[in-house]
Amino acid sequence: YTKETLDVALEELQSENVVQRKKCINFISMASRSELFGKTCDTLSVQTWFLSSENREKLIRVLHQETEEKLLWEYLLILLMVCERYIDHGCYAKDFAKESSCVEFKQRAYEIAKQYAHHSSAIVRQMSGSIIGYMGDNDVWDIFCNVMLKKRDLLTISHITLGIRRHCTGVANGDNHFFGGTMTNNQRIDILNSLRLVYQKSSNKSIKGMCLRTIEELENTKEVANKA
């Protein structure tokens, strides 16, 4: 993954051919998730590419033009992964995330997520929620509950339970900023009930296991919060 290969992929995202768009979005998505400082990724060059305001806005323009829900989900995943891996990751300089290019990228990602949080597609709402939660906004809990009423596949539930467990870890560690911010008691009850419903309705052992572990962790987190 280099600046040059990403430039080509970004240009070809404007293709009317959905197969071509899927190929290019997958390439950019893999770059956003690739091993940092690994053999296949020129990390600092790719970081600069993603954080360039020109590339960011081009990516957002093609995102707005996209009509395929799975590709929209992938665009939103890219925004989240850039925030996690190319801005906030612990391997960069201490105040790197405070640089204007980083602040602007996260602000735009948050704006886009808010915009797509009520999209007709449940998977698009889920990934919008994941970004909103990453930014510490507790609107994520209502979004996740809404999604679990409509969509209970392995990928969707794995992203939702990951977010909930990140929240639990952040609370337990006493972090200043953590996934989903403050969870109200009503939101906690709704999330637990939604997870129990998914558990009851699913015949998939992996989904059932994720739900059980997350329910247990969230129930334990409530006790920790009450003691504090």
Task: Go through each PLM region and give its residues.
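N-terminal segments that cap or nucleate solenoid repeat domains
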Residues: 1-31
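Amphipathic alpha-helical scaffolding segments comprising HEAT/armadillo-like alpha-solenoid repeats
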Residues: 2-11, 34-62, 86-116, 137-149, ...
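Short inter-helical turns and helix N-cap capping residues of alpha-solenoid HEAT/ARM repeat scaffolds
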Residues: 16-17, 67-68, 120-121, 152-153, ...
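Conserved hydrophobic register position within alpha-solenoid helical repeats
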Residues: 23-24, 75, 128, 160, ...
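Structural signature of alpha-helical solenoid repeat scaffolds
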Residues: 29-33, 77-84, 133, 165-169, ...
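Eukaryotic acidic, Ser/Thr-rich intrinsically disordered low-complexity regions
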Residues: 192, 196-228
